[in-house]
Design a protein with these regions (language model features):
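Juxtamembrane/interface segments at transmembrane-helix termini
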Residues: 80-100, 181-196, 220-228, 244
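Membrane-helix exit/interface motif
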Residues: 146-157, 179-188
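Hydrophobic membrane-spanning alpha-helices of multi-pass integral membrane proteins
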Residues: 137-145, 169-181, 200-219, 236-242
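Extracellular/periplasmic helix-loop-helix junctions in multi-pass membrane proteins
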Residues: 156-162, 217-240
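Alpha-helical transmembrane segments of polytopic membrane proteins
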Residues: 67-72, 166-172, 233-238
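Iron-sulfur-cluster electron-transfer modules
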Residues: 1-149, 156
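Hydrophobic cores of alpha-helical transmembrane segments in multi-pass inner/ER membrane proteins
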Residues: 70-83, 174-179, 240-244
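Alpha-helical transmembrane segments with an aromatic anchor "belt"
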Residues: 125-131, 160-170, 183-203
Length: 244
């Protein structure tokens, strides 16, 4: 399944970057390092005032700047994904005429399968793999919603505790536990789905794990009231999260 996904992604990606990333570890690592260094340099030269007598996250990294960055990144990624999806549609459906109303009536099936991926349960007798993936996706989408849609409330300025942290704890627990389990499964190679792993398979899990870990570490030092530790962990967290 992973091999098929990589091949299809490389076929429909008009930029050619997917093919380069999948065929060259140097390209993948180079791109990640470039983006990470770019984030670090942005904060080195354009951060706000550094207040050390108390935690002041929004002074160091104004939430409006972060929100604009989130939206810009989401727009760029959406543009790439949608353009590739349109390209895939043209390749597959160019000679097939489908009534427009059928797209409307089948939209619910698309949404249902996107959210639940229920057809995965039909692959073999073991349902635990589907359940783990479903829980992982729920944690990932929860965290994405917090940092993109609700960043104004999720990014707390001082060392106080905010109720949105409850959702962050859920996402953190899910992402850490499931990624560690996936690491173990790929190392032991007991399941056929994890018997053969490419570099990109490992890389995504590593980035997801350390994005989650640095996020909860930043939260911990902020709650503890350590200003410099909070700012440093904030930059490290984004340097890992953005390349992912």
């Amino acid at each position: 399944m992973m091999a098929t996904r990589r091949w299809l992604t490389a076929q429909y990606d008009w930029t050619g970057l997917a093919r380069r990333f999948y065929l060259s570890e140097a390209w993948e690592i180079g791109a990640l390092i470039t983006v990470a260094l770019g984030i670090i340099l942005l904060f080195c030269f354009f951060h706000g005032p550094v207040i050390t007598d108390r935690v002041a996250v929004n002074t160091f990294a104004p939430v409006m700047w972060i929100e604009i960055g989130d939206l810009a990144m989401a727009a760029i990624l959406s543009a790439f994904l949608l353009s590739n999806a349109i390209r895939m549609y043209r390749f597959i459906m160019s000679d097939i005429k489908v009534p427009f109303w059928l797209y409307i009536t089948e939209a619910r099936a698309f949404v249902l399968n996107f959210i639940t991926q229920k057809r995965w349960r039909q692959c073999g007798d073991d349902r635990s793999r589907w359940l783990k993936h479903f829980i992982l996706v729920s944690g990932y989408l929860t965290m994405m919603s917090l940092v993109i849609v609700f960043i104004r409330w999720f990014q707390v300025d001082d060392s106080s505790w905010h109720f949105t942290s409850i959702f962050g704890y859920y996402a953190t627990g899910v992402l850490l536990v499931i990624t560690v389990e996936m690491f173990r499964s790929r190392l032991k190679k007991e399941e056929s789905i994890h018997r053969y792993s490419e570099f990109s398979d490992w890389l995504f899990l590593i980035l997801l794990f350390f994005t989650t870990l640095t996020g909860i570490m930043m939260h911990a030092v902020r709650i503890a009231g350590w200003p410099m530790g909070t700012y440093v962990m904030y930059v490290i967290h984004l340097a890992v999260a953005v390349p992912m």
